[in-house]
Amino acid sequence: MRLHDGIDRNLLHHERKGDGTMFNFFKKKEKAYYDVIAAPLKGETVPSSEVNDPTFAEEMLGKGLAIKPVEGKVYAPFDGEVAMVFDTKHAISLVSAKGTEVIIHVGLDTVMLKGEHYTAHVESGATVKKGDLMLEFDMEAIKEAGYEVITPVIVCNSDDYKDVIRTTGVQVEPGDTVIELDK
């Protein structure tokens, strides 16, 4: 897995485990980030700039990334609260236990589907734990209706953070870290 600066995260993780010698205290310690956002879907992460919608590509709503899903399920990316499930069920906004505001927007212009092909498993105000199933969608039906299923994952209050580190260009499973935030 590659970080934003091209460093192989798996290599770093392996090196940080230590080699059992007494010199482990010289090794760089893993950074503790203020908040972490896990992948809410299974698929490939891509930079926001690759999203075919200027609202997301130009990060008008905040910094983030997008996921090209391979499965029609959306999971909670952290412990927190569902701020809103859009009436059309194509998007969910959440607030983490640490105050990070995230919107997960399934597909582009999918508001036009008026909720068709989406099933919400949570309601506004619900408390969620990382990994809870929040939403299901019929990827093939959405594509057949003429819509892209690429899913932006946006930190709406990204200006509150000094660093927003995104992991793109990799295949992810729900629960894999994709965004790290530092104050």
Predicted regions and their residues:
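Intrinsic-disorder-associated, low-complexity terminal segments enriched in Asp/Asn/His/Tyr and depleted
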Residues: 8-13
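Contiguous, well-folded functional domains in the mature portion of proteins
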Residues: 3, 18-183
